[in-house]
Amino acid sequence: MMWPQPPTFSLFLLLLLSQAPSSRPQSSGTKKLRLVGPTDRPEEGRLEVLHQGQWGTVCDDDFALQEATVACRQLGFESALTWAHSAKYGQGEGPIWLDNVRCLGTEKTLDQCGSNGWGVSDCRHSEDVGVVCHPRRQHGYHSEKVSNALGPQGRRLEEVRLKPILASAKRHSPVTEGAVEVRYDGHWRQVCDQGWTMNNSRVVCGMLGFPSQTSVNSHYYRKVWNLKMKDPKSRLNSLTKKNSFWIHRVDCLGTEPHLAKCQVQVAPGRGKLRPACPGGMHAVVSCVAGPHFRRQKPKPTRKESHAEELKVRLRSGAQVGEGRVEVLMNRQWGTVCDHRWNLISASVVCRQLGFGSAREALFGAQLGQGLGPIHLSEVRCRGYERTLGDCLALEGSQNGCQHANDAAVRCNIPDMGFQNKVRLAGGRNSEEGVVEVQVEVNGVPRWGTVCSDHWGLTEAMVTCRQLGLGFANFALKDTWYWQGTPEAKEVVMSGVRCSGTEMALQQCQRHGPVHCSHGPGRFSAGVACMNSAPDLVMNAQLVQETAYLEDRPLSMLYCAHEENCLSKSADHMDWPYGYRRLLRFSSQIYNLGRADFRPKAGRHSWIWHQCHRHYHSIEVFTHYDLLTLNGSKVAEGHKASFCLEDTNCPSGVQRRYACANFGEQGVAVGCWDTYRHDIDCQWVDITDVGPGDYIFQVVVNPTNDVAESDFSNNMIRCRCKYDGQRVWLHNCHTGDSYRANAELSLEQEQRLRNNLI
């Protein structure tokens, strides 16, 4: 509800005139629906429809399950469970748009059903209908976005920022303290502090990418306000006279992901007798930045132990603060089902990780499918929980969730100004070109190029992330065919080495004085970015189940020897007499990403191998290694990508890649490539290895030649016991699937890495 206002005063809202786009394709005549009610469940509530820019209700006359089914499907749910009459979810306001709705049950939208017509009704709001939908989302219903959070009259609040007041706050990024301003009609407007609460500050800070808020010195800011108001030439005095206090009052619960969800009272228009902010001043907010965005690292303190705290991480996101949600339970990482997944629960995840509130809650494995167990389903948060583990939830195995239903988030992050310090020039489109960066040279900002020495896919990934362009497709060292910016011809950065977790190239290691062996020009670094990427994952269980030993005669290993699939000691044997002891196994490599996995080299450069009569499209596709418990290699092998193809695909997905007849090579999204145990080079040569306990390791795409959304799951490891005659593999797992101490006990070393993505 809005606060009551005198009818003689005209009000105007700081709201966008355009409606937020729907998350599903709809025709221009399709009406938006929403569910409103006292519960925090997104799948149930009072049914409301948007018509002529105003939300209204639906009467329960003639309403039944088939009408509820049409409404639920339009809202993105699979079906309807039931419906409720007599305003069970509370009485609505405004018009009753529809009455005597009659559907066959096959309509795609509610406005395709029969009714009395728009606004033709003899009902009262005590007859408002409600629906309860099945919590499972339809395939293809992608996300709940902040832009879909409509305010009054179907409109939404615009952008928010903090205008720094203190001189010290103006010199640093991100800005964490200042006056709240909102953007309308191309101008920034102020917000009155009357009735301003910490709940309001929490919502504003969340929108700006900060997990929490803190109190401000209101007495100091009031003193500054009074001094500036006495100065007739001050900007503040001028703005006040122009009645720039657009929002007069805000009332938030603190759990809202956006100000559009708060109650807003809007200031009177210009020329009205009532002042916009009588006796008040602009609202001032102070936010607390997450650990990734603080200007100075906090001093080490004794942290309170939370033994039961549920650990959360994000995977496969293109940007900082986005990814598939994974939680650590029973010492193993697993995913979260998207049933009942919404912005409030997603915001708890974001804040737990040090980001702001969620700007998007994604459904249907939109950021790729995870591995292992599905730990949680039907997560229901109220918004103030410290961790996701404090929310109500079911076990993921209880309601038939699959990894196709993995939930993901996109969080609000602070504006660090990084995106303005890199650009691409000369490319065919905005997603490719020569990399130009801005650095300080003798205290003066200067644009220039990056030396391509040591330039690789990791550095390109950081660049694309900094630009907000997703993943890197190619890292280019030779860019003579792209014309850069004339004023940025000089090399200003060289020796760049990134770990992959940086938010900007400027955070990577690099030379002090620039040293580039090639000089500027054609050897400047370049990138080509893409919105989505593949994600290769090996079936660890199949490796464990199919491992065995074979003593293979040298007479049958000529081709394998030619392709370097045997240990070095094989070079000194008396061919064709003797044998090699081989640890053989089968492997399945799945593409769980959002784009096809294709060889980096074009087919014109594939190499023909006469012995096996096949083409190599990637020099090394996998590494097979046997390690001691301290990580030293005792045996190794490699497998060239002689045949990348879709061996099998899920039902309904067509195979796209096949090696026969010099066909295209690759692995399509959702498909997998199988290498049977009985083909050449599908082994590790352990002839020279003595009995003992070892670690068996397989790494896919080991040199990161082809871009992926997540490289951390490219490795599997198994415990291996070899007694000289037999071999046992057990505890096979993806490299990042267990928590650190479980890995330590298994391998005596910590291999887990969890970056910002």
UniProtKB/Swiss-Prot annotation:
SUPFAM superfamilies per UniProt: SRCR-like
Sugar-modified residues: N199, N630
Domain annotation SRCR: ranges: 33-134, 160-288, 312-412, 422-530
Main subcellular location of this protein, as a coarse class: secreted
Intrachain disulfide bonds: C59-C123, C72-C133, C103-C113, C192-C277, C205-C287, C252-C262, C337-C401, C350-C411, C381-C391, C451-C516, C464-C529, C498-C508, C559-C565, C611-C659, C643-C649, C671-C681, C718-C732
Keywords: Copper, Disulfide bond, Glycoprotein, LTQ, Metal-binding, Oxidoreductase, Repeat, Secreted, Signal, TPQ
Region annotated Lysyl-oxidase like, chain positions: 534-737
Record note on cofactor: Contains 1 lysine tyrosylquinone.
EC code: 1.4.3.13
Signal peptide: 1-25
Residues annotated to bind Cu cation: H612, H614, H616
Residues carrying the site annotation Cleavage: A570, D571
Cellular localisation: Secreted, Extracellular space
Enzymatic reactions: L-lysyl-[protein] + O2 + H2O = (S)-2-amino-6-oxohexanoyl-[protein] + H2O2 + NH4(+)
Entry cofactors: Cu cation; lysine tyrosylquinone residue
Superkingdom of the organism of origin: Eukaryota
Residues with the 2',4',5'-topaquinone modification: Y675
Family: Belongs to the lysyl oxidase family.
Function: Catalyzes the oxidative deamination of lysine and hydroxylysine residues in collagen and elastin, resulting in the formation of covalent cross-linkages, and the stabilization of collagen and elastin fibers.
Protein name as annotated: Lysyl oxidase homolog 4
Lineage of source species: Eukaryota, Metazoa, Chordata, Craniata, Vertebrata
